[in-house]
Design a protein with these regions (language model features):
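Intracellular juxtamembrane helix-capping segments at the cytosolic ends
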Residues: 137-150
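Extracytoplasmic gate region of multi-pass secondary transporters
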Residues: 30-75, 79-83
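Juxtamembrane intracellular "pre-TM" segments in multi-pass secondary transporters
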Residues: 9-37
Length: 209
């Protein structure tokens, strides 16, 4: 708390900007372009949420590892996610959103396969690291792409994407928990595998139109 106050004490809120949109509805219907971005973000949002809530339980139930090793699962997710988000901007500027997104999706694929089929706790930890890094920047890139669409005001497109993506983020833990209870926790993470493959085919939706 002290460090947060120290680093944020000089921050000032931005001036309120005029909003040209008159849409005050609680639900903003996504356009086809925004819906493509929603599909793209399904896998990173689901896997991020699943890893945060279920990675420790996965390690405990599958490998019966000590609490310290169990906790390392979520540490690996958070550490790689933070690192990728911190350094991603410069790589996006150099290589572009499409190439960075492809690398991210491939990283998620490697991570999910490792977690689903691993017979070693350390390989699973590496898998969680790949999931954290792979899921780090796709949603921020999708939000940026939604804001750059010219068919509607940026605020509407961003809200449309955010409301559905965060709904997935919030619903993922209980749904995956139900799957884990009835079919096994490996299967609950495996649900993300087809979604990762689908995300690969929607990377082109990040292009500005």
């Amino acid at each position: 708390t002290f460090l947060t106050i120290l680093f944020c004490s000089k921050y000032k809120t931005a001036d309120e900007r005029p909003n040209s949109s008159v849409n005050n509805s609680l639900f903003v219907k996504p356009t086809k372009a925004v819906m493509a971005l929603v599909v793209l973000t399904l896998s990173p949002m689901l896997l991020e949420s699943a890893s945060i809530d279920w990675s420790v339980i996965y390690m405990r139930d599958i490998f019966f590892t000590p609490p310290f090793i169990n906790g390392m699962a979520i540490v690996m997710v958070a550490l790689t996610q933070f690192s990728v988000r911190y350094y991603a901007d410069q790589y996006v500027e150099i290589y572009g959103t499409e190439k960075v997104s492809k690398i991210s999706v491939m990283a998620m694929f490697i991570g999910v396969v490792s977690v689903c089929f691993s017979n070693s706790p350390y390989l699973s930890l590496i898998g969680f690291a790949f999931i954290g890094g792979g899921s780090a920047v796709i949603f921020p890139l999708a939000m940026s792409a939604a804001a750059q669409k010219i068919d509607r005001p940026a605020a509407i497109n961003v809200a449309s994407l955010a409301q559905i993506s965060f709904l997935v983020f919030l619903l993922a833990p209980p749904i995956l928990g139900f799957i884990a209870e009835n079919f096994g926790i490996r299967i609950s993470f495996g649900i993300g595998l087809p979604l990762v493959i689908v995300s690969w085919f929607f990377i082109s939706s990040l292009k500005s139109k």
